């Protein structure tokens, strides 16, 4: 199964194309801003490098966050726009799920994943023995650190970088009904409509 995996939730713009356990092409660039302008050309580049066309893709996978409102939407919108006319399934996984995927769920480890989402805030989540203790939560740094310390984690993953290849491998066997591509924003949009309403 050929899976195209995308991530635009953080400072990196990433696209990976894998076939079962084989990496066909992979690109990741630290760009901070401009994901919307870079992602489509990046996908075209990895398709060309693999000598494949869009019709050769079987499934899409996208990192759903936590990330900024704008950045998170870039890969999500691209994935859904790519998949819809081709009737392809789209799998959504959080960056925290991707970063903890290599831990053995039978090891009974308490693992905390932390992302610095700027503005003095951290987004963090926790798992224990493969089960969710805390879904991604954004809090002021001092509050988050106290909560994490009280939890007493065995391992902490901080500001990890999503590997698109791992995202593709994980997504290959997942059901889109159980892992929908829904955004996980670290905070709401900065832009406001007249009257202070969110867009």
What is each residue range found by the language model?
Residues 43-59, 151:
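Phosphate/pyrophosphate-binding loops at sites that engage ATP/ADP/AMP, CoA/4′-phosphopantetheine
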Residues 26-31, 64-68:
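A short glycine/serine-rich beta->alpha loop
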Residues 35-50, 96:
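Short, well-ordered amphipathic alpha-helical segments that serve as non-catalytic structural scaffolds
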